[in-house]
Amino acid sequence: MAFVIGRRFSFAAAHHLAGLPAGHKCSRTHGHTYEVEVQLASPALDAAGFVADYQTLEPLRHYLDCDLDHRDLNEVLPFQPSCENIARHLFGWCQGNLPSGALVTAVRVSESPQSWAEYHAGPNTGASRPAVTP
């Protein structure tokens, strides 16, 4: 059993996806208001009764606001900016940049209220080291 908490963030950005069939709407530059949900887990609570203080996630807010918000993701990310790849990237970013006590278990990225992708800790991602980020 474990306690799980989450926090949502949003950012607006444009992108296009290369390699799609001619005429596919995602092959044209378009934008989304992305919703990012990060989940942290712990088998026990700390002395304050927290899995982690939500302030632990402020570096992620800063990264989203300063590096991704109102940008063309094709210009600022070194990979095809699909929702799946963005989720994997943010998972790895969190593991590498948040305080070591914060056990990130999943990152979900929504590009619309109906569409999302999630990358989560599993047997091949490890809990203490960043996942391979494209």
Regions found by a protein language model. Name each.
Residues 1-134:
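Charge-rich, low-complexity N-terminal segments
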